[in-house]
């Protein structure tokens, strides 16, 4: 709750969500009020930014990418209802599709990684596969392209493709981070 007092509430929503179940009714009420305010602000800004993404101008691609980057911190905390989480993730994917169609070069490897992770969370494996493939096509020598595929195949239980991606990764001179190593250990 100290993060909230300092104003760093957007990255603390999961903690605020936990405080909703506090035995102290005042704490629970305060947490509910903050969470409701933050989520209402989030919904409003998403709608505002979404409308900017629909405007056909020279900033359209940047607006789409910025919306994805804006949505991700809230979506990754999974504080929305399941239905709204799914809807917002689909909207995130939709605006990234628009950016990709217009100028895929402006999409960074981290943005691909974010959308893949959110799609995995809602178990939309078909769309996640599409974005994993696009990330690999555009960033074939970047670790996140491989970790996205590894996470996808891990989530689907597809050992054959998981090990195929792992072998491809081994052939490259890419430093593997601890998260990827742990994923590989878990699946073996």
Predicted regions and their residues:
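Structural detector for internal amphipathic alpha-helices that build alpha-solenoid repeat scaffolds
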Residues: 2-7, 18, 29-37
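Residue at a conserved register position within TPR or TPR-like alpha-solenoid repeats
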Residues: 3-4, 71, 78, 115, ...
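Amphipathic alpha-helical scaffolding segments comprising HEAT/armadillo-like alpha-solenoid repeats
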Residues: 9-20, 44-48, 129-131
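Structural register within alpha-helical repeat arrays
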Residues: 15, 67, 114-115, 149
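Amphipathic alpha-helical repeat scaffolds of TPR domains
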Residues: 29-36, 40, 56-79, 94, ...
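Short coil turns that delineate tetratricopeptide repeat
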Residues: 58, 100-107, 139-141, 174-175
